[in-house]
Amino acid sequence: MGQEMSTQSDIQNEDQKGNKRNLKGTQGKNGLKERSTSISKEIVKNSFNNSKLRPGMFIQNSNVVFNEQYKGIKILGKGSFGEVILSKDKHTGHEYAIKVISKKHVKRKTDKQSLLREVELLKMLDHINIMKLYEFFEDNNYYYLVSDVYSGGELFDEIISRKRFYEVDAARIIKQVLSGITYMHKNNVVHRDLKPENILLETKNKEDMIIKIIDFGLSTHFEYSKKMKDKIGTAYYIAPDVLHGTYDEKCDIWSCGVILYILLSGCPPFNGSNEYDILKKVETGKYTFDLPQFKKISDKAKDLIKKMLMYTSAVRISARDALEHEWIRLMTSKDNVNIDIPSLELSITNIKQFQSTQKLAQAALLYMGSKLTTIDETKELTKIFKKMDKNGDGQLDRNELIIGYKELLKLKGDDTTDLDNAAIEVEVDQILSSIDLDQNGYIEYSEFLTVAIDRKLLLSTERLEKAFKLFDKDGSGKISANELAQLFGLGDVSSDCWKTVLKEVDQNNDGEIDFKEFRDMLIKLCNY
């Protein structure tokens, strides 16, 4: 808006100096109006083309009716606020876990704020080890949160079953937790209730042991210059600085230290017969390795626990440093990721071919890649992404892309001895600028999936129809300028200006986009 006003002011000054009489005549007014409108259209087009695309933009409080969109299959679990129902999407056949929260139990203003804050945080977080929210809607009686089905159950139940974990397995789990926490802290989000009950196993496959951090009801944004004061958390895992009412994001690291201690020993470091006794022991910060279970545990593992359970948060290890701790590197260095070569070749081809400046097409593809794919469909791509993510923070930076690109070419069987490093860097820079849809300088997990996935799989009729419905808010069968403005959060701009954007796709010049035009746009983008 400021840019627009400044530009119009410059035009007026120029006209006043050059030819004042034109401002008094009808032709002069029309000329100025036309130039002003032209500039407005150019500004909205630039705003649109420069808008940042994130998967969270597609999670809006929609008018979905549960029984029309989903079929409930069975109850997966119950809690004090509601229940989680295994449900099938009637249009795509995909299964989801839907958290159904009764509004009777969300009467207090603070409870509703907590729920809405959780939704907002999940909208912005995009990480392999953080639960993915697909949809959020409500009716007169309930709120609905739609997420993936994680069939492996809680880490808590796995601990009960195993009693304790081998060091290598404990390291694999805590590395993933720390990866998620590193990403969260980098984005100024603190969880504040990390515990085995809030860590789910993606599948029942004991070899993969992919974890997902859930339950962001107590999470919040934080500022590095300010301390938090709310005394919240769970007795066994709460940090002493939280009990004292002055703490920072490293309260999450304390919780990770407690979890690692439990994984290796089967016992909590701070125990008691009731919550009061537990909290008193937490307040002292004193724990012991003088248990029979710890006799066979390496000094390096104990060293990481010590650094995580430092009483003073200022000297407590950070999430990123913990992720790079020697014990974690040692225990996970031999993790072999068996990558399917045909999937690898296809993903490299798709990434290199992805070239688009058409924001609407990018947005539609991001929605389909991030919200309409299943865990099984993205399994191989997840392996490739994790192999490229050298520092384990859940994002790919420029250096990781360069190193990873070379490694993937080797895996594919290409001879990389004569590769021109400068040429590779140029190619990586082109890839980064093309697929960094939120323009933050990194490739997020969903961005990678979106551009690397099999186009034939992604552009199925069912997925295209569901994606079209996201844009077509009123169900008219056409996407209007107003609907586009609503999705991209630029609703204060006139619909006339949006029509300049629609023209790129609007083949029959009716000022709207029908399903055929929408489908053709995506097929053209994907060279499919």
Swiss-Prot record:
Residues forming coiled coils: none
Entry superkingdom: Eukaryota
Catalysed reactions listed for this entry: L-seryl-[protein] + ATP = O-phospho-L-seryl-[protein] + ADP + H(+); L-threonyl-[protein] + ATP = O-phospho-L-threonyl-[protein] + ADP + H(+)
Active site: 193
Record localization: Cytoplasm; Cell membrane
Post-translational modification remark: Myristoylated; myristoylation may target it to different subcellular compartments. During male gametogenesis, myristoylation is required to initiate DNA replication but not for mitotic spindle assembly or axoneme activation. Not palmitoylated.
Binding annotation for Ca(2+) 3: 472, 474, 476, 478, 483
Record Pfam families: EF-hand_7, Pkinase
GO CC terms, sorted: cytoplasm; plasma membrane
UniProt keyword list: ATP-binding, Calcium, Cell membrane, Cytoplasm, Developmental protein, Differentiation, Kinase, Lipoprotein, Magnesium, Membrane, Metal-binding, Myristate, Nucleotide-binding, Phosphoprotein, Repeat, Serine/threonine-protein kinase, Transferase
Main localization, broad class: cytoplasm
GO MF annotation, one: calcium ion binding
Keyword Phosphoprotein: yes
Binding annotation for Ca(2+) 1: 389, 391, 393, 395, 400
Region: Disordered, residue numbers: 1-36
Protein name: Calcium-dependent protein kinase 4
Species whose genome carries this gene: Plasmodium yoelii yoelii
